[in-house]
């Protein structure tokens, strides 16, 4: 996995802090994880530690974040120290995690969309499965196979899609995070069948797809029609993998 956020920590955090979809996304992840009280959580591609921190707030026993960007890990540690929470962090590429240990819940928000090939997608799931307890869950948030740039560039939701081009058996997208200067990131979109095959080969027992849980309160908080693009051409989707 080659993407690095070291040079764009400020732009990414500005996007993340202002993103109108963040509350929807964390609500969805929490709901899909099931009962989290007293559970151990591993937050992969953790960034600032937002998701792991939210799971702690909802009763998780522990949360450990892993990210390949040292800049993100430094920021996450400083934020946890400032807030006084007990989330812990390590800087590692998910493909090369040296530590052992199984967790009740493993979170992967916007991780697998960095797989630049189907082989890399399969290897990423294979690298993650040993860290999921038997009976545990991997909760994934990734690029929606059904999203199409022709139907909207997603700029209203905090990140702008500049390109959406065929790539191998999927698509390659160029995303722009706002800032001065803007930051560009490359992501990859794969079909549901590709994910399901990777999940099965890795050794998970079951997988299910879920749409983000947009609630009426979210709709009421914005101007009429604001969420239309999110509902009908959402860039993200969730996948729950059972072990």
Model-derived features with residue positions:
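C-terminal lobe and adjacent flexible extensions of AdoMet/dcAdoMet transferase-like proteins
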Residues: 198-243
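A short acidic, Gly/Pro-enriched loop at the edge of an enzyme's catalytic core
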Residues: 98-106
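A short glycine-rich, Lys/Arg-flanked "PGG" loop and its adjoining helix->strand segment in the class I
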Residues: 122-134
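SAM-dependent methyltransferase
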Residues: 139-200
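Conserved class I S-adenosyl-L-methionine
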Residues: 1-36, 50, 54
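Class I SAM-dependent methyltransferase SAM/SAH-binding core
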Residues: 42-44, 48-96
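A short SAM/SAH-binding and catalytic strip from SAM-dependent methyltransferases
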Residues: 105-119
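Nucleotide donor/acceptor-binding cores
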Residues: 38-40
């Amino acid at each position: 996995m080659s993407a690095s956020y070291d040079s764009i920590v400020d732009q990414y955090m500005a996007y993340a802090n202002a993103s109108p979809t963040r509350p929807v996304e964390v609500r969805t992840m929490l709901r899909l994880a099931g009962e989290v009280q007293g559970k151990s959580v591993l937050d992969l591609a953790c960034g600032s530690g937002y998701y792991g921190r939210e799971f702690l707030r909802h009763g998780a026993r522990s949360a450990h974040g892993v990210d390949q960007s040292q800049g993100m890990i430094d920021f996450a540690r400083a934020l946890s120290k400032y807030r006084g929470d007990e989330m812990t962090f390590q800087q590692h590429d998910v493909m090369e995690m040296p530590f052992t240990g199984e967790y009740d819940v493993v979170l992967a928000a916007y991780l697998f969309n960095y797989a630049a090939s189907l082989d890399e997608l399969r290897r990423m799931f294979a690298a993650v499965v040993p860290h999921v307890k038997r009976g545990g869950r991997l909760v994934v948030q990734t690029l929606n196979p059904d999203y199409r740039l022709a139907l909207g560039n997603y700029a209203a939701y905090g990140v702008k899609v500049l390109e959406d081009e065929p790539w191998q058996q999927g698509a390659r997208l160029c995303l722009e995070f706002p800032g001065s200067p803007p930051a560009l990131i490359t992501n990859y979109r794969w079909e549901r069948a590709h994910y399901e095959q990777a999940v099965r080969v890795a050794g998970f027992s079951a997988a299910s797809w879920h749409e983000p849980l947009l609630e009426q309160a979210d709709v009421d908080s914005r101007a009429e029609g604001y969420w239309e693009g999110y509902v009908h051409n959402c860039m993200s989707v969730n996948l729950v993998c059972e072990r």
